[in-house]
């Protein structure tokens, strides 16, 4: 894997949030799936990590965002973690995968990836977390990839164009969206031959 992406391990991430402004709105849910290579050299989904997040002090939540995501921040079974603890839960799994593949660091894969990375970076800064495994600005964005591969930029339509089922009832769950984005990325990336070691 370390040779496939120049020492970067692709890790698919989705966040659910209290709005669109990473500096102002709360991180509410995060999921991550490091990718693996199977025996045939094809990218496949690894083991997921997932956490609900307690809105950090001083952050805001737009009620319209909760209508879209369906998140009930007061649900008794939400079992949300404080932001620093949630990040560490995700980052520990990512760091372990980076080490296992002898990679230098993780690169975030996402649908509108800079949105997800922006919220991750804002949460890192806010919580004082010192061990962020992700590249600070480089990403693989499935909006661009799906637009080129299938002419589709909306996640649901891109996933269906790639030949997968999309369940609207599960959409806007960070874990479900991460799984679907990961399948989409793998389908597109696996259609290309692996680069030569010199490439």
Regions from the language model: what does each represent?
Residues 53-76, 142-178:
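Active-site-proximal helix-loop-helix substrate-binding element of RNase H-like nuclease domains
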Residues 107-114, 118-119, 123-124, 156-199:
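Acidic, Mg2+-coordinating catalytic module of metal-dependent nucleases/exonucleases
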Residues 117-137:
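Substrate-recognition/cap helix-loop segment adjacent to the acidic, metal-dependent catalytic center
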């Amino acid at each position: 894997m370390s040779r496939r992406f120049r020492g970067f391990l692709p890790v698919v991430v989705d966040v659910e949030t209290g709005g669109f402004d990473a500096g102002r709105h709360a991180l509410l849910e995060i999921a991550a799936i490091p990718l693996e290579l199977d025996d045939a050299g094809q990218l496949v989904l690894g083991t997921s990590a997932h956490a609900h997040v307690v809105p950090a002090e001083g952050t805001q939540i737009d009620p319209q965002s909760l209508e879209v995501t369906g998140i009930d921040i007061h649900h008794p079974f939400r079992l949300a973690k404080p932001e620093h603890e949630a990040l560490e839960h995700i980052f520990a799994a990512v760091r372990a995968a980076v080490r296992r593949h002898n990679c230098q660091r993780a690169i975030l894969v996402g649908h509108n990836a800079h949105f997800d990375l922006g919220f991750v970076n804002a949460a890192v800064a806010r919580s004082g977390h010192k061990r962020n495994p992700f590249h600070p600005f480089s990403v693989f964005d499935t909006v661009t990839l799906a637009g080129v591969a299938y002419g589709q930029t909306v996640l649901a339509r891109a996933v269906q164009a790639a030949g997968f089922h999309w369940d609207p009832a599960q959409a806007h769950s960070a874990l479900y969206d991460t799984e679907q984005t990961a399948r989409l990325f793998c389908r597109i990336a696996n259609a290309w031959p692996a680069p030569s070691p010199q490439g």
